[in-house]
Amino acid sequence: MTDLRAPVPPTGDSPADNLTLAPASVTDDRHRLHPAWIVAGVGFVALLGAAAFRSVPSVLIEPLHTEFGWSHATISTAISLNMLLYGLISPFAAALMDRFGIRKVVCSALVLIAAGSGLTVFMTQAWQLVATWGLLVGVGVGSMSMPFVATITGRWFVRSRGLVTGVLTAAGATGQLVFLPLVSMLATEHGWRLPSLLVAAVALSVVPLVWLFVRDYPSDVGVRAYGAPAGSDAGARVPIAGGANRALKVLASVARRPGFWLLAGGFAICGASTNGLVGTHFVTAAHDHGMPPTTAAGLLALVGIFDVAGTIASGWLSDRIDPRYLLLGYYSLRGLSLLILPSLLGPHTQPSMWVFIVFYGLDWIATVPPTVLLCRELFGADGPIAFGWVFAAHQVGAAIAATGAGLIRDLQGSYDLAWYLAGALCGIAAAMSMLVRRPKTAG
């Protein structure tokens, strides 16, 4: 077996090749910057840039409704397609990363996001909204969603895997929310087209960083995975073929396991109660109660800020506490908060609304680190692709909620029923989490 501790001569291909010559022993990890942290850092920026576009739809529902006369349900359909593809593309993207490499897949995805975002400024009909927001951007963000996180942490980290999963997850989730105030302000003062161009530029600007600094495996630069013990082959390149076929084969395999369906079902409810409902319709719902859109967008941005702390803390806790207990707590408390949300909405931000924002931020995507770890425990090397399918269920739930809530709003003139249904479903997700059976060898 090749000694992965030995340094590899620089190839000159990129700055990353010259930053990673230090051996990757446990001792060295304590004194030098392991290249895994460089990959994780660039991954954080890439996920943040990709998430920027996803902040646009919820803010622009009303401007598009006003300019084109499209119904809330019509606009929500385009957003739903985006969410659906965001999930359904994920497992295939994970397999393509195995086949062609992280760098090529992620750079291609960022270009797609930029193209879809930029083309929205030329649309005049509803089908064009579906083609740009829904199709192009949906494929792009789906190609570098949560399986991207699972692939980086699975290949590059042994130690601190849960923590890094939390940090990278926070980038994807928080990026969607922290851009909201800027997008809302630009849309209010300059129209909805400028924000679309801005987020296209953000996504495109990340491409050079990914190309220069991201590598597929630790062994590509002569090191082991961060925290791997001496003599371990963790981080070695594993020849994998199959691409899309492998994604389907993994699905056929994991679909025979009850644990997969329990995780997928719970995660579908997670998507419905976050991206699908709150992420898409909170600004419009608050506006229905007299709150200015910029204020509502600012509140969602605060959700994103607190999400950083909550998701990182969840990753840290996932390394120490049974992930099922964490999911039980997250889903239960989220359900309770959704049940009381209708009573908190109004023209002014009351202290009780601030409490909701802080709590919902801490809980927003805190479910991801324990779910990723459970997928790795249950499905081993197929964990990233299995999580891709679990995440697909997350986005199916989000798409259904986005469309369903829009229909409820059009039919009843209020989102109240949507909040109550989501709260009840979160209780079901909490129960499903505790039914997952961990392997006997799991911590």
Report each predicted region and the residues it spans.
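A late C-terminal transmembrane helix in Major Facilitator Superfamily
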Residues: 167, 176, 365, 378-412, ...
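Extracytoplasmic
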Residues: 38-72, 90-93, 180, 276-283
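C-terminal ends and interior cores of transmembrane alpha-helices
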Residues: 111-124, 333-346
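Helix-to-loop junctions at the C-terminal end of transmembrane segments
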Residues: 89-102, 311-323, 409-410
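Cytoplasmic helix-loop-helix junction between adjacent transmembrane helices
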Residues: 133-170, 380
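Helix-loop-helix hairpin linking two adjacent transmembrane segments in secondary transporters
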Residues: 168-221
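Extracytoplasmic gate region of multi-pass secondary transporters
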Residues: 57-61, 252-312, 401
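Hydrophobic core of transmembrane alpha-helices in multi-pass small-molecule transporters
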Residues: 48, 116, 128-144, 268-269, ...
